[in-house]
């Protein structure tokens, strides 16, 4: 067994000097049980040690479960169902079809760039951790701080918006069962949303073994539902729309001019569906051969989502009829649920709306699982108020249960904005896309700018010669769409339909900066090493 070289260590295996240990971290190789107070089980844990972290999770996610997790985070079938109103309002059927194709290409560039970095740094910190090696030392703490808070906000907004959609779909199914006699209200949606988030918190309080079992069969189930739904729509549709109507007949009802500009708001559906690319990274410490399996899962899952999502949008466009107003203003609150009702009747629409609800439940579970790991990893680096509490691992389940329930409380609070108006909740969808994508492209941009100078070493999964081109397009695309996602999607603008994404973003970032300047900057040094820090043992109880 190799020993620790070039690092000053005392008899108890503690670094004599924090800065010396940090600067010599890359010299840390395989560490034996006799040299530290924890056991190294395999090469995966040795790699984690080289990155500076104690292995504390069990690696119980199989190859299929890892792919299924990555695929579930998009919730393709259900997320298209719940966000189809955006392209319909911005440009009708052509917006749904072409926005998916165009925006999906940009999203794929982000996903592949993220997968590349996940391979190089397979830790629960995700892209936040990469700042340690991709940003010059002087700027690293503040850049890592901003990236971490953006990722945390984006993950929370992802859970909130997913579970809001979950509540909408469940109540839409109830409405269909009453032949539209029952119409959901804001208060009903908020109440069901809170119950759904609590349920997802309970599921995520289970052990990793149970989470693996729950996740494992999801991908097969999801793909079967998607294919069967498309077949049923095509088989039962009494009259298809023309190719001209589907691909070229742009009809904008957003109030924005020119129509070409209005068309761009359809990108939000794609950006919300194809995001949270690094969710798989947040369970990297629970995956065997994570440096290969995690990026493979991200790339494959997003590629399938991109292709099948485009096909599904085309099928919906051909079968939805031509009365856009009735779809957009449907009492069900979901245009696709109305399409199901029109084409498949009461029983068929109930079946696929309920299946959408089940699928997006899985998305909510995996999104919360990823966000809990984000909170845990960020707390490990002492970047949150009261980090010592959120960093605890439950000894029975070996999962961050306290972080899960912090997530539950925050996400419910975030969704209370929906009590004001249904339109106001749009801000949470926008925040999810903007915050997450910027938490990705900042490290990607740093890799482009500083990677060569800082001797960046790619992982076993990388893009080779195409890396710089894909990375650059990902950065440019994110900068472009972020401007669109901060704007109101309809005009004239009123307090009810205003896009409050900028308020949510500014509020959370302002809090993080105040916390930074009020004292965190003195103690926060960026992603920390903890290979020998007994005081940060996540299994210790208070």
Swiss-Prot record:
Glycans are attached at residues 6, 394. Keywords: Amino-acid transport, Glycoprotein, Golgi apparatus, Membrane, Transmembrane, Transmembrane helix, Transport. It comes from the Eukaryota. Pfam families: AA_permease_2. It is found in: Golgi apparatus; Membrane. InterPro entries: AA/rel_permease1, AA_permease, Amino_acid_permease_CS. GO terms for biological process: amino acid transmembrane transport; gamma-aminobutyric acid transport. Belongs to the amino acid-polyamine-organocation (APC) superfamily. This is Uncharacterized amino-acid permease C15C4.04c. Its main location: Golgi. The chain crosses the membrane at residues 61-81, 95-115, 139-159, 188-208, 217-237, 255-275, 298-318, 348-368, 402-422, 424-444, 469-489, 500-520. It is a multi-pass membrane protein. GO terms for molecular function: amino acid transmembrane transporter activity; gamma-aminobutyric acid transmembrane transporter activity. GO terms for cellular component: cell division site; cell tip; Golgi apparatus; membrane. NCBIfam families: 2A0304. The keyword Repeat does not apply.
